């Protein structure tokens, strides 16, 4: 978005063809590189902000579907990609440039300990990911359940440091595939289910988590927004809470300014809320 003339330019053309994208989630900014996972094409896209306006510039796309993977989110860790998805070998997969995949860490504790790993992966499918600037730890916040998972990064494997659950889930699991070819919903959320995290931002010392705390009954399709920022240290201890005036969908942190910027979109009006720490 150009604030001077009000024009909007697509960084990635819409579509399923080469060099195009469909549905982007979990956008991250690392230096001059903006990255996001394309849920539609299962590719990880990276855009150089210093070059994107150059005629003929093309973002970098990396497919994550090799080795029969079904990814749902991803983030870069140095020269490797870390993804979550419908994985039964472990909650996290680190993919190396060589093409080798390493899975690690069990799924968080569920309300029903008898669930299969496939149902657990569906239950914890929608996540927002963030990596500590030193690349030593990962924060994974679940959008549906309010579960914050913090892991230490050891080479190509992860070790869980802490697991924070804010509220119990109000869900039903479909353990058997129905007859016919109808759409299958393995996890059904109650209208009273309290939704979890909308977005993450991190610093060397803290994890800033934008929290929804909303239900489908009260907010319908606006459950992916929140007015609360919960601050945790990298061991998972709650440090403080900030309240925002407007419901926001995403946040970012500026280390240079020690400031959080939150994006609010209410009543067809977009606004950047500034929170000086």
Predicted regions and their residues:
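Conserved blade-ending motifs and adjacent loop-strand segments that build the rim/top face
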Residues: 12, 19-21, 65, 165-182, ...
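Blade-loop segments of beta-propeller domains
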Residues: 4-35, 39-40, 60-65, 117-118, ...
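Repeated scaffold domains used in trafficking and secretory/extracellular systems
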Residues: 19-28, 65-78, 124-128, 195-199, ...
């Amino acid at each position: 978005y150009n604030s001077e003339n009000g024009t909007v330019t697509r960084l990635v053309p819409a579509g399923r063809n080469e060099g195009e994208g469909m549905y982007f989630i979990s956008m991250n900014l690392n230096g001059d590189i903006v990255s996001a996972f394309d849920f539609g094409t299962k590719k990880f896209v990276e855009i150089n902000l210093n070059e994107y306006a150059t005629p003929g510039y093309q973002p970098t796309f990396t497919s994550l579907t090799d080795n029969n993977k079904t990814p749902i989110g991803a983030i870069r860790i140095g020269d490797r990609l870390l993804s979550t998805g419908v994985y039964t070998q472990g909650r996290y997969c680190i993919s190396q440039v060589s093409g080798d995949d390493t899975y690690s860490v069990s799924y968080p504790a569920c309300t029903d300990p008898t669930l299969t790993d496939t149902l657990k992966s569906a239950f914890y499918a929608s996540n927002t990911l963030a990596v500590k600037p030193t690349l030593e730890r990962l924060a994974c916040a679940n959008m549906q359940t309010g579960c914050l998972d913090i892991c230490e990064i050891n080479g190509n494997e992860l070790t869980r440091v802490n697991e924070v659950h804010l509220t119990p889930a109000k869900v039903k699991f479909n353990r058997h595939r129905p007859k016919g070819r109808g759409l299958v919903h393995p996890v059904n959320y109650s209208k009273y289910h309290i939704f979890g995290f909308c977005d993450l931002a991190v610093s060397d010392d803290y994890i800033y988590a934008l929290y929804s705390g909303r239900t489908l009954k009260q907010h319908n399709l606006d459950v992916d927004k929140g007015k609360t920022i919960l601050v945790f240290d990298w061991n998972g201890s709650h440090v403080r809470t900030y309240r925002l005036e407007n419901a926001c969908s995403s946040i970012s942190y500026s280390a240079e300014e020690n400031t959080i910027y939150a994006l609010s979109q209410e009543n067809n009006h977009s606004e950047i809320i500034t929170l000086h720490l």
